[in-house]
A protein has these predicted regions:
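Short, basic, alpha-helical segments at the C-terminal edge of helix-turn-helix-like DNA-binding modules
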Residues: 41, 70-78
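Amphipathic alpha-helical packing segments from all-alpha helical-bundle domains
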Residues: 78, 123-169, 179-183, 194, ...
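Short amphipathic alpha-helical segment with a characteristic S/N-K-E followed by hydrophobic residues
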Residues: 23, 38, 61-66, 77
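Hydrophobic alpha-helical connector segments
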Residues: 68, 82-123
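Short hydrophobic/aromatic patch on the recognition helix
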Residues: 49-59
Length: 225
């Protein structure tokens, strides 16, 4: 259970957090059927029961709202990775859980992942907005411990640290190139849904798991070569 007392957070911050989360949920619901370009701000505002003017007080554009979702997703999978790492004493197991969990969540709405891929391609390597506020972290992940410490900057805020821990634990060779392996993991995360997600969304999780096993095996093989 989260140790932060939500009641101790100012009411204005809690209202702001609830509105942002409501807008993210509205966006995800519509992305399941429509592209980001097709979705109107007026629709999102109506779904979240706010005015269009209020929407723009929170997010300059729809793209900024999608970026905000990616930040919230980062918190969610970061909490999962932290739990799995502790339970299995394995950073590689945490990476696998992160990818598989995301694939399973998006299997019912593969368009969402495709829109995220398009969004990332359009906007990288742009800077991330400011960090997610504490009230929103607590509301979004009420059962997560130390939610204020979770990274909110996408894969880049999670994977390199886990790969470094895997090297330190001996799960990967000491001479592993973490930067290159991070790129390979990212290619698996985005590439598999792009290639097969629209046609076979239920196959993405297993394919990603297999790709990761190949990556780990390749890294270990370099040590013995």
């Amino acid at each position: 259970m989260n140790s932060t007392n939500l009641g101790a957070i100012p009411l204005r911050a809690r209202k702001r957090a609830r509105t942002r989360i409501a807008l993210v949920e509205a966006l995800l619901n519509r992305l399941a059927q429509h592209s980001l370009d097709e979705i109107q701000v007026s629709e999102l505002a109506a779904d979240a029961e706010i005015s269009q003017a209020t929407f723009f007080n929170y997010f300059p554009t729809k793209a900024d709202l999608l970026t905000h979702f990616i930040q919230l997703w980062s918190l969610q999978v970061g909490a999962l990775a932290r739990t799995v790492e502790a339970e299995h004493d394995s950073a590689l197991a945490a990476i696998e859980a992160l990818l598989v969990s995301t694939a399973e969540q998006t299997a019912a709405a593969p368009r969402v992942m495709l829109e995220i891929i398009v969004h990332q391609a359009r906007n990288l390597p742009g800077p991330w907005p400011g960090p997610i506020e504490l009230a929103e972290r607590v509301l979004f992940l009420p059962d997560a411990e130390d939610v204020e410490d979770l990274p909110d900057t996408g894969l880049a805020g999670i994977i390199p640290e886990l790969l470094t821990k895997a090297v330190q634990r001996g799960e990967l060779p000491q001479d592993t190139n973490v930067e290159q392996l991070h790129l390979a993991v990212g290619s698996t995360f985005f590439g598999v849904p792009l290639l097969v997600g629209a046609r076979h969304p239920d196959a993405v999780a297993d394919l990603q798991r297999r790709q990761l096993q190949l990556l780990w095996a390749g890294a270990r093989a370099q040590e013995t070569a």
